[in-house]
């Protein structure tokens, strides 16, 4: 016979209604009781009916993840699997499922999000990128639907989880300056992304602080995070200035292209990158932005926002995750 809520309640020493409230993740149930009920569910191999549960609670127990425009680069980039792992860990701990919103262009992604929001297919959204004047974020904010951004926002009313990317850019540049480098190049992602702008700002601030010249011919931006872009811009950099003595990239895929160019031309130029990196890359160091923790805190925060929404609370959460430079 299939296991029922009554069986779980008996095993956990609570009432069936308490089991139902635990399944609905109600804030009125203590963490200790939730833990006991979930342990009983696991031991009895009980799986609640998601559709029936959503009809009763009006909540789906699903979180939507909004991908950036370039989804191909998303799946190639080691940063995102690490973030997703953190998100999935917390989702699993809280009995939530994940649904991804993507599309080949902005119109398709807007349509996917509209279906999620107006169709009540998810309880909240996490945007896995941050850029200025995003119509997708505007739609969700206007509908007062629970969401947060993994990244930066200029609006003080948008919840977010991020690193201090200005400081991270400064620290990365300072690392090379303290090694004696003076002609440091910067290869970043799209200029419309806050993360690129902030890391560039930190780079420029460090050069200014140490009284080094900022040369715009040593700065390049890639519209896509792809290995070939890193290779292409490395070629341009060394053509302009063969004396470049260090390169900072804001992404591990760009770093791969840079390292390939340097290896092919037998150059002795150190490279530093951000995010999770391929251990095979010959980097001098990388900035560990703690992408796993970014994912975990993002999911924990959106669940708190959803819970606040249930209780008619309005709190704008803005959390920063620490970074550190790791030498290889």
From Swiss-Prot:
InterPro entries: Cro/C1-type_HTH, HTH_LacI, Lambda_DNA-bd_dom_sf, Peripla_BP/Lac1_sug-bd_dom, Peripla_BP_I. Residues 173-218 are annotated as: Inducer binding. Residues 2-57 form the HTH lacI-type domain. One of its GO terms (biological process) is regulation of DNA-templated transcription. Residues 282-291 are annotated as: Dimerization. The keyword DNA-binding applies. Keywords: DNA-binding, Repressor, Transcription, Transcription regulation. Signal peptide: none annotated. It holds the Pfam family LacI. It comes from Streptococcus pneumoniae (strain ATCC BAA-255 / R6). Transcriptional repressor of the maltosaccharide utilization operons malxCD and malMP. Residues 5-24 bind DNA. One of its GO terms (molecular function) is transcription cis-regulatory region binding. This is HTH-type transcriptional regulator MalR. The keyword Ligase does not apply.
């Amino acid at each position: 016979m299939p296991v029922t809520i009554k069986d779980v309640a008996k095993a956990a020493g609570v009432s069936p209604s308490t089991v139902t409230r635990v399944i609905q993740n109600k804030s009125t149930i203590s963490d200790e009781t939730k833990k006991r009920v979930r342990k009983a569910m696991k031991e009895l191999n009980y799986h609640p009916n998601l559709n029936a549960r959503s009809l009763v609670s009006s909540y789906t127990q699903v979180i939507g993840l909004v991908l950036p425009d370039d989804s191909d680069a998303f799946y190639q980039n080691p940063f995102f699997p690490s973030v997703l792992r953190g998100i999935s860990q917390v989702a699993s701990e809280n009995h939530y499922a994940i649904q991804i919103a993507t599309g080949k262009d902005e119109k398709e992604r807007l349509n996917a999000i509209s279906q999620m929001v107006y169709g009540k297919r998810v309880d909240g959204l996490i945007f896995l990128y941050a850029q200025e004047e995003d119509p997708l974020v505007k739609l969700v904010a206007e509908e007062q639907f629970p969401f947060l951004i993994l990244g930066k926002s200029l609006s003080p009313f948008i919840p977010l989880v991020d690193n201090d990317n200005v400081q991270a850019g400064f620290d990365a540049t300072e690392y090379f300056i303290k090694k004696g480098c003076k002609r440091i190049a910067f290869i970043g992602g799209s200029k419309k992304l806050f993360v690129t702008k902030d890391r560039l700002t930190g780079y420029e601030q460090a050069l200014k602080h140490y009284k080094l010249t900022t040369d715009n011919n040593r700065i390049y931006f890639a519209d896509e995070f792809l290995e070939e872009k890193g290779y292409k811009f490395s070629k341009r950099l060394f053509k302009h200035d063969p004396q470049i003595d260090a390169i900072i990239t804001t992404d591990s895929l760009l770093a791969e292209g840079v390292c390939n160019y340097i290896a092919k031309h037998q150059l002795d130029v150190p490279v530093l990158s951000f995010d999770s990196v391929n251990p095979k890359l010959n980097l001098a160091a990388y900035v560990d932005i703690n992408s796993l923790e970014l994912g975990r805190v993002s999911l924990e925060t959106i669940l708190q926002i959803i819970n606040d929404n249930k209780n008619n609370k309005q709190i704008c959460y803005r959390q920063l995750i620490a970074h550190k430079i790791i030498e290889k």
